[in-house]
């Protein structure tokens, strides 16, 4: 692995002078071309962060290397080969790249090609982001971290990659000595997501479950939210029965008709059986539907118990039946008379029966109000009084004729005009 390569120092420095001069010429020419080379060679402090604060042993190792050129621009293969030669030269006074903390800005890191990011990526500490790049996370995800500072959408690591892993972080004790043992002290931190990922957000991975097309959606085609997925009614949205069976679940076994309500099916089955469960208590008639029985019972409220024995007609009042029976009696008397062949005999009209008899004189009348008016002649009562002259009359039309005299009219003339109109 490239991380195990060492930078040669000491005895290999003299042969490198010619290469350093060439590197200076390349840097001046790169400045004019707006490249990524530095204008002047700098010591190793360009590639480490806060070397003054590092332990003395690290400073000694770092100062033993005069300078390391900055990362070449993309596409300058010659510059990259020169930098690789400087790093690989010599075999004495080796200083591994693990002993030096490398720091790149975002612009410098973006200018690297994939081979350069693979080389530096495992050892770069990007302190301005506050995140130590672990060996567990691939370096290309630093592009995601740069988007966070630029105000773009925040990024959360894939939970499948983070699951079951611990983030390794090197901590320095600050006592000025080397870390104990061959391996540095490890601080185990649980995997965390960025602040933009809330607790109730579901991170979906294609390898974890069904495909994207098979995810549950609503009627408009939009994906259902996690909160809706937790509702009890979600099962009803996934398991919907057929529309026809849902609207009309009741089916007649004989004719196959479907009904919405069970009561409608029961009423329909009566047409097959001919059953009439609703019976009238008065006339013992039966009906198949209840509202038919109610309509029939209304006829009993206006019963006509009086029935004519000759023609079968019914009457509500017995007096009406009596008046009707007189018609049959008069017709019989009319048939008993022999009118011959005259036309008058063919139009024989029976006289009106007079059933209302006066108890004083024995006169009979066909109408009751005629009897009442006749009764006034026996009692002498005059119930109709004039409001102006206090005269009284036994009949109302007599009073009306008298009132005309108070209006300055001749009662005879007005009476004649009224009779002439008829």
UniProtKB/Swiss-Prot annotation:
Organism from which the protein derives: Mus musculus
UniProt keyword Ribosomal protein, yes or no: no
Name this protein carries in UniProt: Zinc finger protein 641
Gene Ontology terms, MF aspect: DNA binding; zinc ion binding
UniProt KW keywords: DNA-binding, Metal-binding, Nucleus, Phosphoprotein, Repeat, Transcription, Transcription regulation, Zinc, Zinc-finger
Protein role: Transcriptional activator. Activates transcriptional activities of SRE and AP-1.
Gene name of the encoded protein: Znf641
Lineage of the species this protein comes from: Eukaryota, Metazoa, Chordata, Craniata, Vertebrata
Family classification: Belongs to the krueppel C2H2-type zinc-finger protein family.
Major subcellular site: nucleus
Superkingdom of the source species: Eukaryota
Entry's localization field: Nucleus
């Amino acid at each position: 692995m490239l991380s195990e390569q060492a930078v040669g120092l000491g005895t290999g420095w003299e042969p490198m002078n010619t290469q350093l001069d060439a590197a200076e010429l390349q840097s001046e020419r790169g400045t004019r071309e707006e490249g990524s080379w530095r204008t002047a060679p700098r010591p190793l402090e360009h590639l480490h962060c806060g070397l003054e604060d590092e332990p003395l042993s690290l400073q000694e190792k770092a100062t033993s290397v005069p300078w390391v050129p900055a990362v070449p621009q993309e596409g300058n293969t010659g510059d990259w080969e020169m930098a690789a030669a400087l790093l690989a030269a010599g075999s004495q006074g080796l200083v591994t790249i693990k002993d030096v903390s490398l720091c790149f800005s975002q612009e410098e890191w973006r200018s690297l090609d994939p081979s350069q990011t693979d080389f530096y990526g495992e050892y770069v500490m990007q302190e301005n982001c506050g995140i130590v790049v672990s060996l567990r996370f691939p370096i290309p995800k630093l592009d995601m971290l740069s988007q966070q500072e630029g105000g773009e959408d925040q990024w959360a690591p894939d939970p499948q990659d983070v699951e079951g892993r611990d983030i390794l972080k090197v901590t320095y004790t600050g006592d000025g000595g080397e870390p104990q043992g061959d391996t540095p002290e490890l601080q185990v931190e649980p995997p965390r997501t960025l602040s933009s990922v809330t607790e109730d957000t579901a991170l979906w991975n294609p390898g974890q479950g069904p495909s994207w097309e098979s995810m549950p959606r609503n009627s408009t085609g939009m994906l259902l939210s996690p909160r809706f997925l937790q509702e009890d009614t979600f099962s009803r949205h996934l398991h919907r029965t057929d529309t026809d069976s849902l609207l009309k679940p009741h089916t007649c076994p004989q004719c196959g008709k479907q009904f919405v309500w069970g009561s409608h099916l029961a009423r329909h089955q009566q047409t097959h059986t001919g059953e009439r469960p609703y019976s009238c208590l008065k006339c013992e008639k039966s009906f198949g539907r209840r509202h038919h029985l109610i309509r029939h019972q209304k006829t009993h409220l206006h019963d006509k118990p009086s029935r004519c024995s000759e023609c079968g007609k019914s009457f509500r009042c017995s007096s009406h039946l009596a008046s009707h029976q007189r018609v049959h009696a008069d017709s019989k008397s009319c048939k008993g008379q022999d009118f011959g062949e005259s036309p008058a005999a063919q139009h024989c009209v029976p006289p009106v029966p007079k059933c209302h008899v006066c108890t004083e004189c024995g006169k009979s009348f066909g109408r009751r109000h005629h009897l009442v008016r006749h009764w006034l002649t026996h009692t002498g009562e005059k119930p109709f009084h004039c409001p102006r002259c206090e005269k009284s009359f036994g009949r109302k039309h007599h009073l009306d004729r008298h009132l005309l005299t108070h209006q300055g009219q001749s009662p005879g003339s007005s009476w004649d005009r009224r009779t002439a109109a008829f």
